[in-house]
């Protein structure tokens, strides 16, 4: 199996983390620029990373509703998903009124991880109780999760299609028996679609969902990184090669979808 990188980011190469921490501390941030060899320069609205549940896309809200047990939020960023789930944690407080308890989701704990030390600092400031700056592929990461969440294009972490089995096998190793992975992605095919409905895709080239990004914030330049978008049929078939089932939970408005892998 491919050896995945187990590093965390250094603070001087963590533009997104710097933007998140600025926004957390001052309520505003500069432009978080997103560059790619494949697309025009774009920017990521930092405020969006601090979205409340009601501001989240339907697919993310759906994923949060399906979470149960001991939860791991991978690539948690500013912690919006972890915070939302933390509120749902079944309180151990006996004085909590019983009628309230039935409405609560059965979530026992929430752990957020990110390779950005600055993002983890921001999450702790926001009240995420367990935010650890650790790489998903680091052996020191605890195991035994009932739900692993990978949202905002969770397949991205694999980087390339050939690494997706490595990602799935790693997640599988972190799951309890009966556990589930909730992951979202998009089919990028639409980018290559012509007016007549045909597609400009080189079938002998790299998989069309493989892209690269580089982020810049103020004078902080991140390293360029590979990011993977996967269509659902391919995600499902790769999950099956790893001895997992893939289920399409819901589709969004823009070729995006939420999948449950178990």
Language model region names:
Residues 2-35:
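N-terminal auxiliary segments of SAM/dcSAM-dependent transferases
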Residues 51-70:
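Conserved alpha-helix/loop element of class I SAM-dependent methyltransferases that forms part
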Residues 78-89, 102-106:
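Conserved SAM-binding loop of SAM-dependent methyltransferases across substrates and taxa
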Residues 116-117:
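Conserved SAM/SAH-binding beta-strand->alpha-helix loop
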Residues 127-138:
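Conserved SAM-binding strand-loop segment of SAM-dependent methyltransferases
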Residues 145-165:
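A short SAM/SAH-binding and catalytic strip from SAM-dependent methyltransferases
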Residues 164-177:
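A short glycine-rich, Lys/Arg-flanked "PGG" loop and its adjoining helix->strand segment in the class I
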Residues 177-234:
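SAM-dependent methyltransferase
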């Amino acid at each position: 199996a491919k050896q995945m990188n187990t590093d965390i980011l250094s603070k001087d190469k963590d533009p997104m983390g710097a933007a998140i921490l600025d926004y957390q501390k001052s309520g505003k941030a500069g432009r978080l620029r997103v560059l790619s060899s494949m697309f025009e320069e774009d920017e990521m609205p930092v405020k969006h990373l601090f979205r409340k549940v009601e501001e989240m896309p339907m697919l993310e809200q759906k994923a949060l509703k399906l979470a149960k047990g001991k939860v791991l939020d991978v690539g948690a960023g500013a912690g919006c998903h972890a915070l939302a789930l933390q509120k749902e944690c079944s309180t151990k407080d006996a004085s909590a009124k019983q009628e309230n308890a039935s409405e609560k989701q059965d979530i026992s704990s929430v752990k957020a991880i990110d390779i950005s030390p600055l993002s983890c600092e921001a999450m702790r400031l926001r009240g995420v109780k367990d935010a650890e700056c650790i790489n998903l592929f680091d052996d020191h990461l605890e195991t035994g999760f009932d739900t692993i969440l990978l949202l905002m294009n969770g397949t991205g972490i694999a980087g390339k299609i050939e690494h997706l089995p490595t990602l799935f096998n790693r997640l599988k190793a972190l799951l309890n028996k009966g556990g589930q992975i909730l992951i979202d992605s998009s089919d990028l095919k639409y980018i290559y679609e012509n007016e007549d409905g045909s597609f400009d895709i080189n079938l002998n080239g790299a998989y069309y969902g493989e892209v690269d990004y580089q982020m810049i914030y103020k004078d902080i330049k991140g390293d360029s990184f590979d990011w993977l978008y996967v269509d659902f049929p391919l995600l499902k078939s790769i999950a099956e090669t790893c001895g997992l089932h893939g289920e399409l939970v819901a589709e969004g408005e823009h070729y995006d979808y939420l999948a449950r892998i178990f």
